[in-house]
Amino acid sequence: MFEKYCNEKKYVFNAPLPEIFDFSVFEYAFAFWQWGEDINQIPASDTDDKKVFDYWINMCEPSYFTNYNATASFDVQAARELGYYGYYTKPFKKYLSIKAAKGYLKRLMVPKGAENVKFSPALYNHTVDFLTKNDPKMVYIYGDIDPWGASGIYGLPFTKNKKNLHVYMCPGGSHKARILSFPEPTRQEIINLISGWLKE
């Protein structure tokens, strides 16, 4: 089914299809929590293959692993400045066509001509330095089940005792967390904060 699907979509990958399949399977767990999916929607073990496949593909579209997708510019920035998450493959080695997932971002997703971009922590270091030494009027919003929150500033020492810098963690929030995602009192607090800044 996977091969047929990718052929029909005319996807071109920088790795053999079995490897793309492996990466798509690993992406499922990350995507599930990132987007705050409902565990009750996970197909039961006796669900027919087509329904399981459709559910999975809807969550982990393999075009994500092409190097010409809509996120190509972000992929380059991730490889150069931001870093990117990996997949823990060791417990699954006997089932995989890949030996390891290390370096998959540059190998699979960075556009041709940019594969050799070197990572530099300069932007990260500059950001942490700026936020440590300054108190900018900024609101950071995270969802508490979003794995991307692991790379955020929530709970870091430099966020304490700031008057203007505010960091909010949305209960049950995913990557889709927005101001409107928060319970009413917190939502209003954020709105009042930003409204006050706009009036200055």
Model regions: which residues?
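Generic recognition of flexible, low-complexity loop/linker segments
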Residues: Y64-N67, Y124-F130, G155
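Low-complexity, glycine/alanine/valine/leucine- and proline-rich hydrophobic stretches
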Residues: G143-I145, I153-H175
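Extracellular/periplasmic catalytic domains that process cell-envelope and extracellular macromolecules
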Residues: A70-A72, L131-N134, F158-K162
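Catalytic active-site module of serine/aspartate enzymes centered on a nucleophile-bearing elbow/loop
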Residues: M169-E200
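Alpha/beta-hydrolase fold active-site neighborhood
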Residues: M1-F119
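Conserved alpha/beta-hydrolase "acid-adjacent" motif
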Residues: T89-K90, P147-G152
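Short beta-strand/loop motif that positions the catalytic acidic residue
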Residues: N134, Y140-Y142
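Short coil/turn segments at secondary-structure boundaries
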Residues: G152-Y154, S181-F182
